[in-house]
Amino acid sequence: MVPVSFAFDFCGEEFRLTADRALYWPREQALLVADLHLEKASFFARHGQLLPPYDSRETLERLALAIRETGARRIYTLGDNFHDSAGTERLEPHAAGMLAALTRAVDWVWLTGNHDAQMEARAGGTLAEELEIAGIVLRHRALKSETRPELSGHYHPRLQLTVHHRRIRRPCAVVSKDGHGCGRMILPAFGALTGGMDAGDPAILSALQPATAIDAVLPASGRLVQFPLWRAAA
C-alpha cells in the first residue's frame, strides 16, 4: 500500500504529511518520524503484561515502505526510538536485520528522547540530541518559548472527533503559528504500539507557546484538514 501524502507549507518550506504519520521534507530528501517506541511489547512482556511481539516488525515495515515511496535519502527520528535502553538487545532477528538494512541504505540520525538516555548507536546510524537544518530545529520535545521554527514529537497527539454519533480518535500533527507567518509542529507518534494524548490537552498547547494559533492537522477524506485547537485573544 502506498503511503499517500499531502503537501503543505511550514515556515516557507514544503512538507508532505503522509497518511501513515510520517513527515517528508522534499528539499532535504528527508523523512521525519517521531516516537517509534521499538520493542515496547517485549518490555511489557518482561513485566508480566503479554502483548503480541510484532510491534517492531510492523513499525519497521511501514517505515521501509515510506522510505521507498518518498525516495527519502535521510531519516531523522525525533526521539523515543526504543521503549527502553535494552530494546536493541531484544530485537528478534528479522526485525534486527530490517533495521540494519535501513540504516545502511539511508543517512540515518537518531535524535534522542526521554526513553533514550542510555541509547547507543549499536543499531546503526548516528546519535544527536538536536539538530538545526535550514533554520528549523529538530528535537524530541518542544522547548517552551522556542522562537525558531521547530519540529518535535514526545506527546503522541491524537484528535478526538464525533462522527455519526461515534467518537473516534486519529493521530495528528499539531501546528502552531506565530506573528511572523511561521511556527512549530509536533508530529504524531509513528510506532505501531503507541497511545496518544488529546491534541487539545493543556500540556501540548502550553508547549507551543508563544503562538497566535494552534491547529490539529491530519489527512482525512483524501485531503489535509485543519481543526482549530486554540486562538490568541483578540
Regions found by a protein language model. Give the residues of each.
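Extended recognition/assembly regions associated with phosphoester-bond processing machinery
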Residues: 1-234
